[in-house]
Amino acid sequence: LSCPDQQITWLRNLLGNIGNVFHVGTEPGLGQSMKLANNLLSAAALAITSEAMVMGVKAGLDPHIMLEVINAGSGKNTATQDKFPKAILTRSFDRGFTNSLMHKDVELFLEEAQSLKVPTGVASAVQKLWQTACSEIGPGADFTTIVQCVENRAGVEVKGT
C-alpha cells in the first residue's frame, strides 16, 4: 500500500485478513508501481521457464527431473514451483488468470517504465511473447498456455507422465 504513515495500522487491520499488507511508501502511485514490478517478474518467470523447459524436453530431459533440479538451485521461481507442476505438466492450464490480463500487466509496466525513462529490453521481449500467446492461443486462455507458443515452434510438448 501507498498511504500516509498514520493510516497504515488501520489499513493493516482492515486488509490483513485477506492478504499480505506491505507499506511501500507515502507517495500516491507507489503501490501501483510495486504491483507492476511484481507482475512483470511473474510474467517473465513463466515465459523464460517455458523456453527452458521446452528446450530441456526437446533435448531429452524428463520435465519432472528438470523441475526437481531447478527447484533445488538458483533458477527456482513461481513458475517452476507452482505453475509447471500443477497446471502445465498436468495440461490442466487452470490457474485462473488469462493471457490478456498478463499481457495488459506487462504493457502497463512498459508504459510506467517509459514514463520514467527506464530501459526495458527484456520486458519488451516478454511483452512480445505474451502478445503472441494472445493472438495464437487466445486472449481468454489461461496464462499458463504461454508454454504452448514455445512448444508449437519447437515441435515438442512439455507434459508429465
Give the label of every model feature segment.
Residues 63, 120, 140, 157-158:
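Residue-level detector of short coil/turn "hinge" positions at structural boundaries
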Residues 1-34, 41-77, 116:
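Internal alpha-helical scaffold of NAD(P)-dependent oxidoreductase catalytic cores
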Residues 32, 82-143, 150:
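Interdomain hinge/lid region at the active-site interface
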Residues 22-24, 100-104, 155-161:
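Electropositive, surface-exposed helix/loop patches at the edges of structured domains
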Residues 141-161:
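Short, basic/aromatic-enriched C-terminal tail that caps enzymatic domains
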Residues 40-41, 54-55, 97-98, 135:
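A generic structural signal for short
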